């Protein structure tokens, strides 16, 4: 409930791909479920978006390996003429954004946002206290009318604590507190896009690095005073490094796209879990997996 999971043509929420000015980002939501793309709050600042292209089929060749859909976000450029600053106070968060010129050939835009949901949830007596923070920036430099470089970044920090000191310790709240873990999530994407315009043709090079870190910790009866009460300590890290080149040739009556990509992904997992069943057991699991991927089109 209260999530914006995207499911297209019967596919799952983990089968979608997201691009921000050509840079792939692993997730666009706060408090996402690992392996899926949904969450209750979006990370991308909507004030920065110029347009969104949604593909549910016939995916572009440059965005292959897609099962369900592609969301391709195009961002605005910073103002070339003057500097502007904007503050936003919402029902659950506060934010500030700025954009403007950095010299004659460079523009920027940046935004930072932080929630105060933990105070609202505590006031209405909910057993969990979520907090999220995100930041986004874009810098664009035009060397000349034919060459430009864009550097962008997107990051988020999610933290969900347990409200063990709440006054309304009803049976329902006690049950939720008994199984809900403390959750910490961090994610970021950094990317650079170089474009060269040659008449009607376009040559692009995209490099990026993204990382998603998840931590779940749970103590029996939420008592952290004894080490033996630790029932769950889950840590995972997903790192992806990507290089892609796209070349668009506009010929009479046809447009030809040619390119290739190479990626290296590293996935690590460290899990410790106690299961309190009729026959108690402890699960200890560790893995470190590296994967190379490449493609041409």
Whereabouts are the PLM-identified features?
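Short acidic/polar hinge/loop motifs at secondary-structure boundaries
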Residues: 24-54, 137
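A beta-strand signature from Gram-negative outer-membrane beta-barrel systems
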Residues: 40-84, 95-97, 104
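Strand-connecting loop/turn motifs
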Residues: 15, 47, 80-82, 93, ...
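Periplasmic-side early beta-strands and strand-to-turn transitions of outer-membrane beta-barrels
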Residues: 80-81, 101-185
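Extracytoplasmic loops and strand-loop junctions of Gram-negative outer membrane beta-barrel proteins
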Residues: 33-38, 54-55, 79-81, 119-123, ...
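Extracytoplasmic beta-strand/coil segments of soluble accessory domains associated
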Residues: 1-27, 50-51
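Face-selective signature of the C-terminal outer-membrane beta-barrel domain
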Residues: 140-158, 180-297
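Residue-level detector of the transmembrane beta-barrel scaffold of outer-membrane proteins
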Residues: 19, 51, 70, 84-88, ...
């Amino acid at each position: 409930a209260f999530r914006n999971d995207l499911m297209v043509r019967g596919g799952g929420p983990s089968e979608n791909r997201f691009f921000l000015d050509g840079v792939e980002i692993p997730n666009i939501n706060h408090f996402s479920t690992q392996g899926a793309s949904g969450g209750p709050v979006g990370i991308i600042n909507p004030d920065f978006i110029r347009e969104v292209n949604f593909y549910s089929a016939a995916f572009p060749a440059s965005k292959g390996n897609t099962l369900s859909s592609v969301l391709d976000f195009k961002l605005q450029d910073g103002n070339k003429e003057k500097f502007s600053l904007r503050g936003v106070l919402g029902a659950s968060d506060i934010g500030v954004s700025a954009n403007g010129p950095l010299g004659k050939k460079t523009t920027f835009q940046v935004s930072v946002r932080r929630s105060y949901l933990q105070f609202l949830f505590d006031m209405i007596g909910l057993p969990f206290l979520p907090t999220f923070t995100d930041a986004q920036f874009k810098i664009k430099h035009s060397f000349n009318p034919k060459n430009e470089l864009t550097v962008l970044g997107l990051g988020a920090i999610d933290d969900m604590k347990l409200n063990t000191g709440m006054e309304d310790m009803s049976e329902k709240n006690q049950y939720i507190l008994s199984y809900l873990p403390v959750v910490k999530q961090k994610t970021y994407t950094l990317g650079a896009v170089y474009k060269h315009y040659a008449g009607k043709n376009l040559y692009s090079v995209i490099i990026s690095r993204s990382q998603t870190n998840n931590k779940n910790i749970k103590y029996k009866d939420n008592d952290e005073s004894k080490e033996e009460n630790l029932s769950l300590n889950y840590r995972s890290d997903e790192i992806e490094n990507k290089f892609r080149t796209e070349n668009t040739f506009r010929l009479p009556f046809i447009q030809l796209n040619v390119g290739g990509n190479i990626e290296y992904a590293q996935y690590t997992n460290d899990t410790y879990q106690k299961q309190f069943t009729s026959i108690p057991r402890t699960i200890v699991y560790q893995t470190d997996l590296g994967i190379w991927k490449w493609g041409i089109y």
